[in-house]
């Protein structure tokens, strides 16, 4: 075992002495040591319950003959960090979490790992760390939040964000907004729609690193504890047979993950995260690969923010296993991929059926023949851009409008709320990319304000930043290269015509080639003054969004 290096031999007496101080007994030495990577934190609703949630996991690890050692990573609540300076730290936290996993597992030579994430950057950060250290690992997330209710109507966090826009327009009162605020988030868990956190938790199942049900079983459902206990037993079994993440996760696993993500209309952030996770697995994956899958994969689900269905509905309809089964049945999925259960996905979904075809549609009744996420290229995005098509109204799939440019999220919010943005505009928000932000902030406040003010069917938004999984509308993000790196989004001027053509995967600045070349040659990117030493380091080493916004010293 890996941990023999800290347990066995007379020369390890100092190590054992320290372990005894942590509660190890004579009979514990020689047993596998399982790292329990928790992410409990008091200010993130998806994580507030994880202090108690971890206890049965540790109990089951002990029963299975191993020793659990719990440690914690940090966590950021993107909703609380949204719309202000704090969002600069959200995406960078992913790298800190991956590094924390590596640091603890390698420093103590742990034999196995059970990861307990839940929210936006914690899931991909832990996935990156787990694939990097490559010890037997199982993921068991904290589970989705229940949807809120006002009368018979379901509400969620996006209802609150959009309510701010409605109040700004005069459609609702402050009292109405307070009622939404008080009812939108009724329990612990990751926010109740198919936003980034739940999208990523669902994809742990597809990648084979999470047990069936991990992505959709609610945090408050008693089955969540049963799943946690099963995960704890399973990680000990994986250590015994030495089945590691890189034995499970292959190029085909990522093909599967993108297919499911695209079929269910997951968050656009999954593109960024899966590219980064693939790199940690030693797998080359490109935006062009995602584009190909998107063109072949139909949209089978529309979950909030794209509809009134929520994660409890998706779970009731059969969950991720039912989506995988429908794709497999139609030759769009590789069922031979292994999982932490030691079974293949094909074996897992063999007896699964769709229980509600309104929530998960059959392929012959799909919402569209191509997927809920699309990659757009063009002179504005030579390396690609991302749009969640499942959240775009039909009349906005092809849109030509005049640019109105903002060089920060704050400027854009002020302009939208101040009435500068009119029907027919394409809002351009730049210098919000990985380097330019730095930190590639989410533009949920601008997009939800546009929707709340009733402009969602007449205004588009493009950015080198990214979006919350709760964003809907004609919103194109991850534009690469970004403005701070000299990308063409930096040369757009107010009044320029921009073409968004989602069916044909195009994003174009409609000026002459001569004018385009002249502007690009003369363009000198701005650089924001950043005081934080961490964000300065991040800006120096972060790569393009088309590469997953990873950190690299190469």
Curated annotation (Swiss-Prot):
InterPro entries: Dihydro-acid_dehy_C, DihydroxyA_deHydtase, DiOHA_6PGluconate_deHydtase_CS, ILV_EDD_C, ILV_EDD_N, IlvD/EDD_N. [2Fe-2S] cluster binds at residues 119, 191. The keyword Iron-sulfur applies. Homodimer. Belongs to the IlvD/Edd family. It comes from the Bacteria. The keyword DNA-binding does not apply. Its cofactor is [2Fe-2S] cluster; Mg(2+). This is Dihydroxy-acid dehydratase. Mg(2+) binds at residues 78, 120-121, 442. Pathway: Amino-acid biosynthesis; L-isoleucine biosynthesis; L-isoleucine from 2-oxobutanoate: step 3/4; Amino-acid biosynthesis; L-valine biosynthesis; L-valine from pyruvate: step 3/4. The active site is at 468 (proton acceptor). GO terms for biological process: isoleucine biosynthetic process; L-valine biosynthetic process. GO terms for cellular component: cytosol. It is an enzyme of class 4 (lyase). NCBIfam families: ilvD, PRK00911.1. It catalyses: (2R)-2,3-dihydroxy-3-methylbutanoate = 3-methyl-2-oxobutanoate + H2O; (2R,3R)-2,3-dihydroxy-3-methylpentanoate = (S)-3-methyl-2-oxopentanoate + H2O. Keywords: 2Fe-2S, Amino-acid biosynthesis, Branched-chain amino acid biosynthesis, Iron, Iron-sulfur, Lyase, Magnesium, Metal-binding. It comes from Hydrogenobaculum sp. (strain Y04AAS1). The modification N6-carboxylysine is found at residue 121. Its EC number is 4.2.1.9. GO terms for molecular function: 2 iron, 2 sulfur cluster binding; dihydroxy-acid dehydratase activity; magnesium ion binding. Binds 1 [2Fe-2S] cluster per subunit. This cluster acts as a Lewis acid cofactor. Functions in the biosynthesis of branched-chain amino acids. Catalyzes the dehydration of (2R,3R)-2,3-dihydroxy-3-methylpentanoate (2,3-dihydroxy-3-methylvalerate) into 2-oxo-3-methylpentanoate (2-oxo-3-methylvalerate) and of (2R)-2,3-dihydroxy-3-methylbutanoate (2,3-dihydroxyisovalerate) into 2-oxo-3-methylbutanoate (2-oxoisovalerate), the penultimate precursor to L-isoleucine and L-valine, respectively.
